[in-house]
């Protein structure tokens, strides 16, 4: 009888302990659930705040791309010639500033011609003709230097040289006439026709402008001689010599 009482008491004690354990487990489970719920509630506001900040950043960046009020033309060294504002289908505005490019010289070649007609030819039975050409060189510096500043403030320098002139003898003739049997003073005339070219070149950057002027010049040289065909027939050769001398005078006059 006593043993049964002890066994019954033990069973009651075990049942009470198991009940307390189940209650504790339920409480722990409830506390864990509440903690997880609390953690979830703490994470959610943080994520929303980050999303709001990100969206705000994107919007502000987009606005800065379309703002044009803070652009002032006088911040440029040279103000724009014109401004073009374009708005696309999405409402974005693009501002484009345009400047006129500075003028540039194109290659130009100009030729002018002037001529002088030969004068005073004398006919004769003796004619001496010759042709020659002369070329001169010059080591002079440029004649002038032109400095130009365009609308952008850039400076261009143009240097001008006079190139050497060239003289070419087109025709040289000498003639004389004498009266047979008497003394006379015939004249020997020399005609020198030269073509003279004067050229100057202007350079500006990679552009070259050339101006060429061509003209003809005539020089008449006269040489007087005294001869007598009745006394010395050898004088016939002196006409040629005088003709050559006249040519030399004409060349010097150039």
Swiss-Prot record:
Keyword NAD in annotation: no
Proregion span(s): 233-254
Low complexity composition bias: residue spans: 27-42, 111-139
GO CC annotation: cellular bud neck; fungal-type cell wall; fungal-type vacuole; plasma membrane; side of membrane
GO BP: chitin localization; fungal-type cell wall organization
Polar residues composition-biased segments: 43-57
Mode of membrane association: Lipid-anchor; GPI-anchor
Disruption phenotype: Reduces significantly the growth rate of cells exposed to polyhexamethylene biguanide (PHMB). Leads to increased resistance to zymolyase treatment, indicating alterations in the beta-glucan network.
Residues making up the signal peptide according to the UniProt record: 1-17
Function, in words: Cell wall biogenesis protein that participates in the organization of the beta-glucan assembly. Involved in the mechanism responsible for cell tolerance to polyhexamethylene biguanide (PHMB), an antifungal agent.
Name recorded for this polypeptide: Cell wall biogenesis protein NCW2
Lineage of origin: Eukaryota, Fungi, Dikarya, Ascomycota, Saccharomycotina
